[in-house]
Amino acid sequence: MKNSGKLVSFLVPIISILLAFVIGCIIMAVLGANPFVALESLWIGAFGSLRNVGTTLARSTPLIFTSLCACFAYRCGVFNLGGEGQFLMGSIVCCYIATQSGIEGLPAILLCLVGGAVAGGVWSLIAGLLKVYRGQNEMIITIMLNYVATLFMGVVYTNWLRDGSVPQTQAVPDATQLSRLFGLRVTSAFAIALVVGLLVYYFLFYTSKGFQLRAVGLNMTAAEFNGFSVKKYILMSFIVSGAIAGLGGSAELLGTQFRLINGFGNGYGFDGVAMALIGQLHPLATILVAIFFAALRVGSTTMQAATGVPTSVSDIIQALVIVFTVAGLAMVKLPGFKAFLGRLTERRKEAA
């Protein structure tokens, strides 16, 4: 019964992706395009050459950070919807250090990354403290903090660190920018994201603290009864998840954008939440989901150029994947579905 449930949960995202592509192909056919040619051009645009692969991995990097942020928090049973705000606060502190400290090179890079992580963690901790000590709903608080961070970033690039007459900040010095990998668009920020993902995976599944954090997420009352400090782990989850998002903001600034401007980091936070859910809160799975979504976004441009299918079709496919996955996982947890799986398992045992 338990193994059958795990298998079904594993298959839900895969089936959701297939269904989303089937509907996407129907839409392409209605628009007068050949779905197979369109899908081929989508694949070529995302993975058809080393250059395209580099672009896909570069686009996936911020998504990996924000999805890991959501994954870590949700494992502790708290809903951190403030990944975007924490991402922005990390990038703001990183931008200030990179452009105003006078330090360049590797020391500046390390200082920027650490500063961004600290900023994201502190920004997230605000919601954690309000939840633990005042009983406030963390979802509402983190969403509100997203707006505050966005407005604060606007002040930064229009006034505080503005570069001349253009509403944008000064650019990160060349010596402080992250290096490209193999001459492609993807930078060492992607490598940092992978390392963070592996560290999160190791911590959650191979350390006693990670086990206790997951136990708190499964049942806070039972965890507290067994002597676990629930408040401590809730605060830890907010700090670490915020630090991951803040580190992502720093890496995005140093590796891809190089300056703050209107629209920087827009949507990354909620995209990360969706990808964490599709990856079923598994750190390594969320990395693959982030790369998949980035591939859809990068490949859609080539698909439009080759077949005339608008890039919005790719957006529809992404939305359908999210809807089908969430609906499927919710259905799997229904008592009736669990009972059906139990009867099916018993029949298989009897047949054997």
Q: Where is each model-derived feature located?
A:
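Cytosolic-side transmembrane-helix boundaries in multi-pass membrane proteins
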Residues: 1-17, 218, 225-232, 300-352
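Helix-loop-helix "hairpin" substructures at the membrane interface of multi-pass membrane proteins
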Residues: 182-259, 283-284
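Transmembrane alpha-helical segments in multi-pass inner-membrane proteins
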Residues: 239, 244-251, 255-319
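Single transmembrane alpha-helix segments in multi-pass membrane proteins
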Residues: 27-31, 37, 44-101, 118-136, ...
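Short loop segments and helix-boundary regions at transmembrane helix junctions
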Residues: 2-11, 74-82, 103-106, 110-167, ...
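Transmembrane helix-bundle core of multi-pass membrane transporters
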Residues: 138-206, 313, 344-352
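Hydrophobic alpha-helical segments embedded in the membrane of multi-pass proteins
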Residues: 18, 60-71, 86-92, 121-125, ...
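Short, non-helical or kinked segments that cap or interrupt transmembrane helices
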Residues: 33-37, 74-91, 132-141, 212, ...
